[in-house]
Amino acid sequence: MTDICCLGHITRDKNTTHKQTVSMSGGTAYYVAYAFNHLPSKVSFQLVTKVGSEDIPVTQEMKEAGIDVKVYPSAHTVLFENIYGENQNTRSQRVLAKADPFTIEEMKPLTGKIYHIGSLLNDDFSPEVVKYLSTKGQISIDAQGYLREVRGQDVHPIDWKDKLEILACTDIIKVNEHEMEVITGLKDARQAAKQLHAWGVKEVIVTLGSEGSIIYANNRFYDIPAYAPREVVDATGCGDTYSAGFLYCRSQGIGFEEAGKFAAAMCTLKLEHSGPFDRSIEEVQRIIDKHEK
């Protein structure tokens, strides 16, 4: 049985910042997989993805890097265009191609303890697929994709129409401050976390950018600091890197505060370059230690 099974589309991304335009592979699945691959193999990991035939070489490269990848065919690979503001906290998006959604049939062979669902668009994972997976293991969700709908090529923010159905069988959720407000209607992070918990989620993570993050679990809040990077180069995949660090720690029975700090330190290192997390666990620990002196 695999400790963490991450499900999601690998994308082709065109990321534009005030400094540069970079074309690269991306998506929650991609960033989470590479983050796990740079951590000691105490936690077993499998990536389950769908790409168009033209992007099979990307998955082959991941396999050659040592990542366990299961690939299902899709008519197209998702193609995102991300344009970031100067502080990297704001982003506008377009989708130039969409991939096929995941099906229950594709989920049947999987044997994960935790299924991390990396939705990119609102129709990637139906409630039926999530409910089916919840009978096989714990459910961890990155909410971002459920709040995005494509009309033409433009990405429009939407409410999460099936949220109550899906949250009722969700163990862990990660949202940012914008997503929490859309989902709950609440502006206060602590109130929003409590509402998500009331809807059935056991562990709620709210990321607050440079203000850090909060974790709500077992009726208690944990305040997690943000560690300042040496420079901000590219925020793409930062939230996914946080999820990877958190799940890596929690799978080993590590406590919420320590897991949150580990995840935050991974984000700091990720911010300092384009592409997925590529540092060592020693560098992650060094950031935490430096700020706790």
Give the location of each predicted region.
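Extreme N-terminal starter segment of soluble prokaryotic enzymes
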Residues: 1-5
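Active-site metal-binding loops of divalent metal-dependent hydrolases
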Residues: 8-10, 28, 241
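Conserved N-terminal subdomain of the carbohydrate kinase-like
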Residues: 12-23, 38-118, 123, 128-138, ...
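Histidine-anchored nucleotide/phosphate-binding helix
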Residues: 27-38
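Short, conserved phosphate/pyrophosphate- and ester-handling motifs at nucleotide-, phospho-/glycolipid
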Residues: 36, 176, 239
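Conserved beta-alpha-beta core of the PfkB/ribokinase-like small-molecule kinase fold
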Residues: 118-194
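Conserved phosphate-binding/catalytic region of the ribokinase-like
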Residues: 156-164, 190-293
